């Protein structure tokens, strides 16, 4: 890849979950259908968790969040999709978008078809692919050897777990593997390290695709301290080491982090360290600043390729 900008890229793939993936995708929404998000589907908290306990299926919350952030044309449909019930009734706290996705899942052959129907309804061009279309939860073995089930409990761990795994073992969505295979650039993060990023790296098909990929890979760091005590204790280099040990080789070419992040120990990678925080929401990436940082990173990768 030489002297190319974001606008020149044929395929950009972003991996993650929560608010982080939506923020990245909305900053790159001008890429349209050339942008693909691979979304974590292990959430078991909030409205999503209640739906899963009642109806089963994959976690829809992170996908809904991404779709919300990709809406560029406000409409009755988008207002409905973003609506959250209030009050004290059984629907209180539920997001209508989650319920719509679950209903469409019942009507569709595959969850990805439900997502595509909503994308069409909301006029979202970017592609969204669940990491797996099979119901799955995150599980960890804590430092004392005890099994810990579910994202909510894992986020409360005081120390890093000995092991993380998916329960039950599931397959990656085939379109997710194909997207990685075709990508020019792959973005990882931002997001909760243990519960938004690591689940993706527990899928063998995805890690194999990442290991084979010749795409430039960029890790985007969080802006604020992680709520998870275990993840908050990790340095930037710790996170890179853990991710690459799961993937099986050193693949991350560049990192984008804020000026407050300690980059000590990070070697042999391009480091782009510049202001990224939005003024209106603490610890959230400003879309334009993030896009500028990505452009800056691409230019440095271009320079490294030409050496």
Curated annotation (Swiss-Prot):
Transmembrane segments: none annotated. The keyword Cytoplasm applies. It is found in: Cytoplasm. The keyword Nucleotide-binding does not apply. One of its GO terms (cellular component) is cytoplasm. GO terms for biological process: regulation of cell shape. Keywords: Cytoplasm. Pfam families: CofD. One of its GO terms (molecular function) is LPPG:FO 2-phospho-L-lactate transferase activity. Belongs to the gluconeogenesis factor family. Required for morphogenesis under gluconeogenic growth conditions. This is Putative gluconeogenesis factor. It comes from Yersinia pestis.
């Amino acid at each position: 890849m030489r002297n190319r900008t974001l606008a020149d890229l044929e395929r950009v793939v972003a991996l993650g979950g929560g608010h982080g993936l939506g923020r990245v995708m909305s900053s790159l929404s001008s890429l349209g259908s050339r942008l693909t998000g691979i979304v974590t589907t292990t959430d078991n908290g909030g409205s999503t968790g209640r739906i899963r306990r009642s109806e089963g299926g994959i976690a829809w919350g992170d996908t809904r969040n991404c779709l919300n952030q990709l809406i560029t044309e406000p409409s009755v449909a988008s207002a409905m999709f973003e609506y959250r019930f209030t009050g004290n009734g059984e629907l209180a706290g539920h997001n209508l978008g989650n319920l719509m996705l679950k209903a469409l899942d019942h009507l569709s052959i595959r969850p990805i078809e439900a997502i595509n129907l909503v994308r069409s309804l909301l006029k979202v061009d970017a592609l969204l692919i669940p990491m797996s279309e099979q119901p799955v939860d995150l599980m960890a073995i804590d430092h004392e050897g005890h099994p810990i089930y579910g994202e909510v409990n894992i986020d409360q761990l005081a120390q890093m777990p000995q092991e993380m795994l998916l329960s039950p073992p599931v397959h990656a969505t085939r379109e997710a593997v194909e997207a990685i295979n075709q990508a020019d650039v792959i973005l990882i993060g931002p997001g909760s390290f243990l519960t938004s990023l690591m689940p993706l790296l527990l899928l063998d098909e995805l890690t194999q695709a990442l290991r084979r990929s010749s795409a430039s890979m960029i890790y985007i760091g969080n802006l604020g301290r992680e709520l998870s005590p275990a993840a908050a204790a990790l340095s930037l280099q710790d996170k890179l080491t853990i991710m690459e040990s799961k993937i099986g080789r050193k693949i991350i070419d560049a990192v984008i982090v804020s000026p407050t992040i300690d980059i000590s120990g990070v070697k042999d990678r391009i480091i782009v360290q510049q202001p990224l925080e939005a003024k209106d929401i603490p610890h959230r990436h400003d879309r334009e600043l993030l896009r500028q940082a990505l452009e800056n990173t691409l230019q440095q990768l271009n320079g490294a390729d030409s050496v």
